[in-house]
Structures are given as structure tokens and as C-alpha cells.
Amino acid sequence: MKLKETLNLGKTDFPMRAGLPTKEPVWQKEWEEAKLYQRRQELNQGKPHFTLHDGPPYANGNIHVGHAMNKISKDIIVRSKSMSGFYAPYIPGWDTHGLPIEQVLAKQGVKRKEMDLVEYLKLCREYALSQVDKQREDFKRLGVSGDWENPYVTLTPDYEAAQIRVFGEMAKKGYIYRGAKPVYWSWSSESALAEAEIEYHDLLSTSLYYANRVKDGKGVLDTDTYIVVWTTTPFTITASRGLTVGADIDYVLVQPAGESRKFVVASELLNSLSEKFGWADVQVLATYRGQELNHIVTVHPWDTAVDELVILGDHVTTDSGTGIVHTAPGFGEDDYNVGVANGLEVAVTVNERGIMMENAGPEFAGQFYDKVVPTVIEKLGDLLLAQEEISHSYPFDWRTKKPIIWRAVPQWFASVSKFRQEILDEIEKVKFHSEWGKVRLYNMIRDRGDWVISRQRAWGVPLPIFYAEDGTPIMTVETIEHVAQLFEEHGSIIWWERDAKDLLPEGFTHPGSPNGEFKKETDIMDVWFDSGSSWNGVVVNRPELKYPADLYLEGSDQYRGWFNSSLITSVANHGVAPYKQILSQGFALDGKGEKMSKSLGNTIAPSDVEKQFGAEILRLWVTSVDSSNDVRISMDILSQVSETYRKIRNTLRFLIANTSDFNPAEDTVAYEELRSVDKYMTVRFNQLVKTIRDAYADFEFLTIYKALVNFINVDLSAFYLDFAKDVVYIEGAKSLERRQMQTVFYDILVKITKLLTPILPHTAEEIWSYLEFEAEDFVQLSELPEAETFANQEEILNTWAAFMDFRGQAQKALEEARNAKVIGKSLEAHLTIYPNEVVKTLLGAVDSNVAQLLIVSELTIAEGGAPEGAVSFEDVAFTVERAAGEVCDRCRRIDPTTAERNYHAVICDHCASIVEENFADAVAEGFETK
């Protein structure tokens, strides 16, 4: 027998290298075959509900890192709730209707307008489902646990029927109406857009300053007066029907030198405009409040048959322009509101493709709206006072990336104004994990207009509206419920397969259709109405979920998207918000903080991370960042996270190896019988348990990450495990000292594995497979540990906090000795301590081998003052010299008692007593010398 075989060197097959990329899929298959998700739900039946409702990603293409961050975050929350006494099923979902899928088919050569609509919709459905399958595998590969075989998909018959019923309830309450209000219009998509489908970019536009001649000054202005107007959308002058001024803004009537004409502009802007127009020696003839100019009549700059009325509007400012804006009710929300209130015509001079129509005038007809500036300038003639190019923030179609326009077209709207206050009141009841999120959503609802819910596309859920022969819209409780039942049985495609009369209840009549003829609506619903109905299609309709949901967790862009639409439809139907809490996340940026873009080549695909590092590293990264704000990710950042993972893994491997001969049922030492240092580590660990439990409850992943890494690096690696080898390797295998420490090791190992499970389920299960004494066959079926409290724990914490300060001072003294070449490593040291009474009391209180704690071979606590040259601190001083004696071949300490034993071992007296007691046969035979 060799001497080193008398050491209790930890033994384990748990690999140092994780091999995550190859092992994770194997484990995931094992979990699926073991039906772990289903077993977890069965275990939690009857417990309090926790419903995290999954916001549906759009089913198009493989997932990106933003998807991964979101789904991993949800998985961590659901797993932690499932292990904390909650019934927390997770139903993943997908959003499947809308323009992107139509665009994909178009790129594939499918010509929608040249084929049967039903066949086209079947192609859309087929493609959408293929993308659901693709993304499902992507999400499962991340280790996300959920009911993957029974997800919700917005194109399924049951979901579409639920959506129709949401619409029906809103129609019954009078919230659905048809109007020709201006809406965001995408000429590139040939469809209206919702606010959530808009993004803003800088756009270079031509702005014009021009003048309208006064036709009827109402006794205030003469007819040789011109009112100066500013516009950044010259094409809308073709539909201008009024000029709007601010009621409380001061305006001046001026005449520049050399001009026969008089002009009206905002007083505050006169100086800057005079410079812009080249006016000199401007004479101010009069000053008016805006309300004095109300109802003055001017003439359209080139269409003299059109009068333009001066009206009042709150939206007019003196921040830029002239303080007067031309008003085209067909091309702007503010214009529409003040225009209709004053009886102005709602003229629309641009068609759905952005082409100017005949009513714009023969010079404009057929031109693209954005190309008419030269024609407008020509028509204005000497009424044009100035032009300039400006860069301003402008709305774009978020899918086609093309600028959009406001355009009044007949659309279906969901009223928000009719129950706005009710929505705002519900927002006050929701818990927002970011206060700014509450403000953002509140302001959006407060300021938003009614919701245009109709779209002029094909792939979507039809609006369940019929028209009588006289054009009267029909959407009764009876007709809508009948459509819902048809969709539930056949899917919404039946709308396109059948004639209107075959979609109505049998025997249905209407006074507007004396001949029994009906038409059906051809517009579909906004996709935000699809996903915004999920609270009904999923949370209400799935028996395992509970409405309202406890939590919605999505990106911060969803304040204008899913959070918004879900809130409106839920309050409209039931008077309550669909969620109790909102947690929002920022965007994933590259390592430099730049937005990820395929064109920039700075994207990171989750699949690439899985191949190089494993999904576990992506999961750990999610906890390492504050995802309430924008976060950074790169392969370099992931390498750093991987290094942290390696430290966690190797620390736990040490615990596994050094408890391999520990049977918790037989070998556990009661807390009261532990050494002070072991009690301290137990108390510290339970502080960690509480911190992590609380952080899981508050969805504070970064807190978990920091607390866990700090405990492993500082409490374990840099302290407890640093001197542990002197106990667990060297003392007798069954000695009290070793069992005391193993008790702490095992407790930490089991509980930290459970605490890690929501974040690192693959690694946790791998560790669990080595814990043969634990009852559950999978750690995912266990519960998170509860934090314990202990008698005198504050006293223990205070004692050891003081000792850690003392230890830091001792380490500085040892470091100085090392630098002076007195010693090499600390085990070569004889440390002499010169304590005051406080430190002397402290050293007596730790009831442990202080030399062992400081990892020195010899320690002396001296009486009296410290000699000259000692390393001194306020309460203590140290001297360091090389320890006397020889190195023990077994414990590696330098000890005066180290000697050649008659059984061929050069060991100290302490090791000799251990060897002679535990290895009598080897002592009798003598140890091998080679």
C-alpha cells in the first residue's frame, strides 16, 4: 500500500468537462421520455395557481437571441414557481397570421392575386405550421420545459373562435364602428397599420413655406393679406381645406419693405422667418390673438374654387414653422379632428399604392406622392416664400421598412375613447416591475386614438361582419356567435369557402335585405387583435390556467404591442386587465452595444451558442445581465460566462467527490455538534438560500447570479474549501472533524443543486444523478430548499465577520513574507500573532485550529508587545518566519515531529496517529517506498 492511499482523496466520475453541446440533447430526450413536465404538473395539482401567459412569438424563421432570452427567462420563473409550492403550467404559443408570411410566399414565387384565395390561405397555413415546428425545436433545445405537444397557435379553430367571441362582446357593447378616419397607411403593404406596426426613422423631407390669400377677412384682415403656412408633406396641399391657428398664440400682421402684400405669422417666429424669407425692414401693422382669426376665409393656393377656412386647434405650436398649419382632414389625425369639428371636407387624393388620384388635379394624377414636390412648387408660383430640406423623425412600416402616410379610408375601428378611463383605472391595479413601464403604458392608453382593427390583406382572421343590400353593416350577437361556432368547427377558412348567406344563421333576415341577399366583409383583423385575444383563447379556455394571468413577460416594445392590445380587449370584455404583473425586458445588443443586424454581421444565433458552449451557458448568461434594460452579448461575453460556469461546476464537483463516502442518514452531524466554522458556513449558506428564494419570487435573476457566484468564489473557494483539504483529505475517514465538514458539504451540495435547477437544469440533473441517497429520481421533481435559522446565528456571523477581517490582515503579513523570500507558500510559515484582548477573545471563540484556517504549519499566540519589524495593524501584529521541522509526506505541513517511521513513512505525529489507527495492516507490512 502506498502512503498516499491513506489520504481520503475525493473520488467521483463526475466529469470536469461538461460536454454540454453533445450531452444536453441526450438529457432532454430522457426528460421527454420520462414525461417530466407532466409529472411536475401532477405533483403540483391542488397547489395555488401561478399563470405566466406566454406572449406568442411570430412563426417565421429560426429563433434569435432575443427570443432565447425571453423564453429562458420565462422558463426560469415557471421552474422556480413549480419548485416553490405553485401549480405553474406553461403553455407556449405562436402568432401565425399577418403580412410577413404573405411576403415569404411572394418571395417563393406565389402570386396571391393570380390564384384561388382558399388555396392561397392553405399555403399560408402550411408555411406557418412548418415555422411553428421549427421554432418549437429551437425552444426545446434551450431546455425550456412546457406543454410542447399542446401549444396554442393563433390559426387553430378553437383560438379563432375565441377571438371572434372577444370581437363579439366588444360589438355588443358598441365599441366596434366603421369610419373614414385617417389611419397609418402603408402604400408598400397596401394596408392600414396599427400603432404597434410603426417604427420611426430619420427621413429627409422637403418643407415648404407658402401663403394663402385672404378671401373674407371678417372685418379683421384685408383681402390683400396672406397667411403664411408651413408643411413637411407638400403632397397634402392637394387636399388642404383649412388653416389652423392656436387660439392663444399671438400673431402679427406685417409688411416687409418693397412688398405690396401683407403677411400673417406667429409673433414669436417673426425674426427667424424674416431671415429665412429675406424680408428687410419689416413693419408690424397689427397684433392678433389666434382666436380673433377664427373663421376667416382664405383661398387654396392654386385651386381658387376651394375655400380654406381658418380654424382653431390645440395641436398648433410655435416650436417650428410659422405657427400656422394647413389642414388636410384626409391626411392627418389632428387635421381630421379639427376639420370635421369645423365641417371641412375630408378629401383623399392618394390611392392605396401611394399614387396621386384624379381629384388631386390633372398635373398630379398618376405621380407617386413623394415625387410631386416640383409640381407643387410650380403650382405655388410666387406664393412660395421658401423651401428647405429637413431631417426629421418619421413613421415607417416596421415590416417593409418604407415610409407611411396618414390616409383617410373606410376602416373598422375598436373604440378606446368609450372606456379609456376604465382601462387607465385597471393599469393602476397592475404591478409593474419597472415603474417607467407603468408610466409608458398609462400614457400610451391616455393619448392613443381609437384602434383601427381592419386590414386589407388575405392571411388573417376575417372580420365577422355582413352587409345588407342597402349597405347596412350587420354584426349582431346572433350572427357573430354563429360565425364563432362555424370557425370552431371548420376554422376561419370557411369564411372564404362559403357565400355570405351560408355563413349566416339559418333563416336569418334583415330589413335592409328585402331580397335576402347579403355580402360579407373582405377585410381581416389586425394581427394585434389576434394575439391580444390570447387571454380568452388560452388563459380562459385552458382549464389548467387562471384568468387574469399572474404575469406577462415580454420585450419593452410590447407596451405598444401585446401588453396594449391585450389590455384593451380584456377590459372591453370583462372590465379587468388580463395580467396582475408586467415584467418587461430590453433588447439584446452586440458586445459593443450596437443593435444586432444581419447586414452588419453582428448577430448571434442561439444554435451557434449551443454548438460552441451549450444552451446552459446561454441560460446562465440570461441571469448574469439586468434584462430590464438593453443587454450585451457576444462570443467573448459568453466565454466569460462559460468560465464562471466552469468555476461553479468544479466547485460542486469537489463537493461531490468529497461526499462520495458520506451517507446522510448515518453520517450527518447535528448542527449543535458542529465546529464554529462549520456552523458559520451553514448560517452563511442559509442566508444565500433566503436571498435566492426571495430573488426567484421577485424575478431578480441578476441578484441570484451575483449572490451565487460570490458565495462560491468567496465563501467556499477562497475560504472554506481552501482549508478543507487539511480536514477531509487528512483526518480519519470516519473522524468527527471530517464528518462535520462533510455534513456541511452535503447540505450545500444538495440544496445548491436544487437552487440551480431553474437556471441550469441540465447540470443540476447531472449532479443529481450522483446523489444516490436523494428520494426524487429527478431534481426537477424536488422542491426548492427553505432557508433555516439557527440559535445564536447573529453572534456566529459577527464572530466570523471579525475573524475574516483578522484573516485578511494575516494574509497581508504572509504576503509580505513571501515577497521578502522568507517563505514560499503559506504552509512553510510559522506565524506569530501579537493580539490585543479583543483579538485574543476572538481567536478563542472560533473553536477551530487557527493554523489550519490560515493554512500555516505553525502558529503561536504571543504575550506582550510585538517586536520591531512586525507587520502591525490597529488590534494585532504579526511576524512570519520559516516553520521549524521537516515536511510531512502525508499532510505536507512542516512539523518538528516529522520523522522516518519504522513502516517506511516520513510523517508527523498527527498523521502517524491517524495512519496507525486506521491502517494497521499497512503499518505492519510497511508502506511501499516507490
Swiss-Prot record:
The biological process GO terms on file are: isoleucyl-tRNA aminoacylation
Q: Which annotated residues bind L-isoleucyl-5'-AMP? A: 554
Main location (coarse class): cytoplasm
Q: Which reaction does it catalyse?
A: tRNA(Ile) + L-isoleucine + ATP = L-isoleucyl-tRNA(Ile) + AMP + diphosphate
- Protein name (Swiss-Prot/TrEMBL): Isoleucine--tRNA ligase
Keyword Protein biosynthesis tagged:
yes
Oligomer status and interactors: Monomer.
EC no. given is 6.1.1.5
Motif 'HIGH' region residues? 57-67
Please list the GO terms describing molecular function.
aminoacyl-tRNA deacylase activity; ATP binding; isoleucine-tRNA ligase activity; tRNA binding; zinc ion binding
Checking SUPFAM superfamilies in the record gives:
Anticodon-binding domain of a subclass of class I aminoacyl-tRNA synthetases (SSF47323), Nucleotidylyl transferase (SSF52374), ValRS/IleRS/LeuRS editing domain (SSF50677)
Species of the source? Streptococcus gordonii (strain Challis / ATCC 35105 / BCRC 15272 / CH1 / DL1 / V288)
Q: Which domain of life is it from?
A: Bacteria
Q: Cofactor stoichiometry and binding?
A: Binds 1 zinc ion per subunit.
- Keywords of the record: Aminoacyl-tRNA synthetase, ATP-binding, Cytoplasm, Ligase, Metal-binding, Nucleotide-binding, Protein biosynthesis, Zinc
**What is one GO cellular-component annotation here?**
cytosol
The compartments listed are: Cytoplasm
**InterPro entries in the cross-refs:** aa-tRNA-synth_I_CS, aa-tRNA-synth_Ia, Anticodon_Ile_BEm, Ile-tRNA-ligase, Ile-tRNA-ligase_type1, Ile-tRNA_ligase, M/V/L/I-tRNA-synth_anticd-bd, Rossmann-like_a/b/a_fold
Renumbered to this chain, motif 'KMSKS' region spans 595-599
